[in-house]
Amino acid sequence: MSYRKAASARRDKAKTRSAGLTEEQKQEIREAFDLFDTDGSGTIDAKELKVAMRALGFEPKKEEIKKMIADIDKDGSGTIDFEEFLQMMTAKMGERDSREEIMKAFRLFDDDETGKISFKNLKRVAKELGENMTDEELQEMIDEADRDGDGEVNEEEFFRIMKKTSLF
């Protein structure tokens, strides 16, 4: 591989790591990182990561933080530099955006605003979309998504089933 191709490949890789973020989002991520890099070392640790993510509007669980650090902290230093943080938050921002899209779709189904998608809601949407589905097929869809067994699909169940389909 020529030097030019190698340099171009490196630039493309760097671009895709934070691709899809606006300059404003990148700046927001940089500010959160800098705020918690109190000693100016260019790195933050696990505790600081949790606080920085909260500042960006996420509520990470302890297990999620541990997994994120393990995935990113390849040298085992227990710290994350800005590039690693940017990469991680780019993925998180994408998740946040797709979650918002999925919740918009949920609200289209939940026209009676109960916080759940009922058989009646699903039947109405299928009819509006011109889908010729039997009641049995519609009930199977509800049953597939319904994890708590209440006969309806709540936001979390809807989110989970939509993520499974890879549409979002």
Swiss-Prot record:
The keyword Repeat applies. Ca(2+) 2 binds at residues 73, 75, 77, 79, 84. This is Caltractin. Signal peptide: none annotated. The keyword Ribosomal protein does not apply. SMART domains: EFh (SM00054). Belongs to the centrin family. Pfam families: EF-hand_7. GO terms for molecular function: calcium ion binding. Ca(2+) 1 binds at residues 37, 39, 41, 43, 48. One of its GO terms (cellular component) is myosin II complex.
